[in-house]
Amino acid sequence: MRSIEIPAGIVEYDETGSGPPVVLLHGLLMDHTVWDRVLPLLPSGLRIVRPVLPLGAHRRPMNPGADLTLAGQVSVVADFLEALDLDDVTLVHSDWGGALLLTARGLDRRVARQVFLPCEAFDNFPPGLPGTMVKLASRVPGGLRFAARQLRVGWLRGLPPLFGQMARRPVPDDLVRRWTDPLLGDPGVLRDLLAYCRGPFDGPSLIRDTEALSRFRGEALVLWSPDNRVMPAEHGHRLAALMPRARYAEVPGAYVLSMLDEPEAVARELGEFLT
């Protein structure tokens, strides 16, 4: 893993290939490995960058006092692109929708194209039943670590409040252990995740900030999974309608984590969009 320092702390990332930059984002309690099944299926001639955002599965805690609320996490993404001096970026969103707000904050100047897999949008922060579970767990002492331990038990992991509505296919044990080890082992990682989960999520403001994507003039692909129950199908269509140069497509048979459920379909759509 490589690493780079930004104002909030040190961000680790994986990078492969050379060419136009493509930045693959991930969701809460996950890291870059959520993309492992898609990565070898993508076209050559691309610089694929996969940051590990401070969303609970990161191995290096951020600086004490860093702003890791939703607003702060948006800045983390912008600062990461800045630190690597990435221009004409294709930014790929999945699950976590914070980076959708770059345009609203005037921080999207390095982003030329965007791809939206099922992700938080409008007032769906935190999203659905899994999001409600995380929010409640963050309010209870020891709650997030208890939830992480539940994720490590296969039959519990498949229940709707955990990963049952996130992935249609079982999420492998090795991935879940990797994602939960930092939270269970490092108080700094727990501190960072609590800072995010306990931060403000104002519905009307989030709707306005999502709708600011109407100002985004680059190409966009909304690659939604209509079978998922966490990110409403309506939101995918609304996102596509917002952006002047957006195209809508679907990945049938997948839930939120379509890159795990249907990696070939996701890679095919991404490849067509990127080349």
Where would I find each of the regions flagged by the language model?
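Alpha/beta-hydrolase fold catalytic core
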Residues: M1-V22, P43-L46, E82, L86-D87, ...
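Conserved HGGG/HGGXW glycine-rich cap/lid loop of the alpha/beta-hydrolase fold
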Residues: D14-R60
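The conserved beta1-alpha1 loop
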Residues: L25-G27, S94, W224
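Active-site loop/oxyanion-hole signature of alpha/beta-hydrolase fold enzymes
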Residues: V49-W96, R268
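Conserved hydrolase catalytic core segment
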Residues: D87-G128
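Helix-rich cap/lid subdomain of alpha/beta-hydrolase
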Residues: P126-D181
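Conserved serine/cysteine hydrolase catalytic core
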Residues: P187-R238, E250
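Catalytic histidine-centered segment of alpha/beta-hydrolase-like enzymes
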Residues: A254-P263, A267
